[in-house]
């Protein structure tokens, strides 16, 4: 009896198992999408980690290690700072009248002339850097009653004592230093930058030896501004054998304005003016070497590609650069949701569609068909739905780059010690800006990823619905992304379904007839469950009957004795 029940159970399972293609009068057609063994995790709005078939890194995290000299004109400061080149330090004479897009200052740069300070150093440096030129025009200033072209052993030009080439050190002539009053109009149509200075002697004796008066004064004026400087006499730390100093100042004279210089001593006079230009030139501190290459974006670490929308190499940039963010990585989904293919599909090797898993090895497209029929099995891509998805995804990266790439430079921020509060505020604003951009970048990528996954899922569903509408009652949805076709469907028939030329009316009668025949003997999963339960109950009942009969027989034969104690 048990043998009969077991065989009945196996027979039922066999009848309940679908054999795609095992009947010449039916076929199975499955729809699926591309999958890879190991996908890439991306972030979406609804999921922190979702696996996709392909993704593109959006954050540039490394530089080339060198500053490219094309397309930007790079001027290497070598041993000179921009201000030393501006003043005309003897070892910076090679920079006279130079131009640049980006002036690169090196950490090894040094001054090699009379010790000086610039009270508004950062502003002057930024002003000259943005002008992009050291073009200098000499002017005929008349300094009557004084000696010109003073020099110092601390500023040698060759073997001789020298001075800054763009400045004129004036001191007494004989025993007199008259009051100087010189004017210079700007009759041109551009701004002129005048550099001048005030000498601070280390002792009163040095003051009178050079300028006669015990205390000098320098006043420089235009129609828009006036600066009056009184020298501060006193000893300072020794630099290149000197304890005196020069303070450097600057004045911009606009077209139609006039420069007025008045002094009774201590004047370091201008020799002319620098021609100011408007532009987007800049300056950057960097020790990266300058190489022969092409790059639109430059950082102190070196040039970086700008084919990504974000970078975390350096906050300081020049050129058309990716936006700086805090994240080390942001991945943009450029493929669909990845569901790796199951390697085994049961004892009969049935195929399955997109609802269960993806398909690996699809090289001709993202979406496609697999079939089993009387001629065997096959697979083909659906190029139309694949192209529809690709067309919408292809432009995503370019659109993100267009939204984020900066077409201007982010300059270094410098403040003097007395501007500490301003510097703190600026740093807070800059950090807040970076935080906001980092958040916006993550949100933007998550939104784009969500859209990509929804889009690719939608294309799969569109293809499935298109196939369902073609087959109509000639096939049954198996619930796993496959259709069981109730008529003979050879490879030509399968091809007509794929390309949209399938005529369901041609196969309607055959499909209807086969459906009724198959349904008459096909056991649904619900009936199989009932058979399993009934078989189990009968088996248990028979086992109990056999066991009880054995016990009764053994008792009668005396092989088993039962004692009941109270």
UniProtKB/Swiss-Prot annotation:
| Lipid-anchored residues (S-palmitoyl cysteine) | 555, 562, 565
Disulfide bond sites: 30-482, 68-293, 80-92, 113-155, 297-321, 489-493
Gene Ontology, cellular component aspect: host cell plasma membrane; membrane; viral envelope; virion membrane
Q: Where is this site: Cleavage?
A: 345-346
Q: Which residues are glycosylated?
A: 24, 38, 54, 79, 97, 181, 301, 499
Could you describe the subunit structure of this protein?
A: Homotrimer of disulfide-linked HA1-HA2.
- Endpoints of the signal sequence: 1-16
Record protein name field: Hemagglutinin
Query: For side Extracellular, which residue ranges?
Result: 17-530
Q: Where in the cell is it found?
A: Virion membrane; Host apical cell membrane
Q: What are the BP-aspect GO terms?
A: clathrin-dependent endocytosis of virus by host cell; fusion of virus membrane with host endosome membrane; fusion of virus membrane with host plasma membrane; viral budding from plasma membrane; virion attachment to host cell
In its record, the post-translational modification comment is: Palmitoylated.
Topology relative to the membrane: Single-pass type I membrane protein
The molecular function GO annotations come to:
host cell surface receptor binding
Q: Which residues lie on this side of the membrane: Cytoplasmic?
A: 552-566
Recite the UniProt keywords alphabetically: Clathrin- and caveolin-independent endocytosis of virus by host, Clathrin-mediated endocytosis of virus by host, Disulfide bond, Fusion of virus membrane with host endosomal membrane, Fusion of virus membrane with host membrane, Glycoprotein, Hemagglutinin, Host cell membrane, Host membrane, Host-virus interaction, Lipoprotein, Membrane, Palmitate, Signal, Transmembrane, Transmembrane helix, Viral attachment to host cell, Viral envelope protein, Viral penetration into host cytoplasm, Virion, Virus endocytosis by host, Virus entry into host cell
Give the stretches traversing the membrane: 531-551
Q: What does this protein do?
A: Binds to sialic acid-containing receptors on the cell surface, bringing about the attachment of the virus particle to the cell. This attachment induces virion internalization either through clathrin-dependent endocytosis or through clathrin- and caveolin-independent pathway. Plays a major role in the determination of host range restriction and virulence. Class I viral fusion protein. Responsible for penetration of the virus into the cell cytoplasm by mediating the fusion of the membrane of the endocytosed virus particle with the endosomal membrane.
Further facts: Major glycoprotein, comprises over 80% of the envelope proteins present in virus particle.
Keyword Transmembrane helix on entry: yes
Give yes or no: UniProt keyword RNA-binding.
no
Protein family membership:
Belongs to the influenza viruses hemagglutinin family.
Which InterPro entries did the record assign?
A: Capsid_hemagglutn, Hemagglutn_HA1_a/b_dom_sf, Hemagglutn_influenz_A, Hemagglutn_influenz_A/B
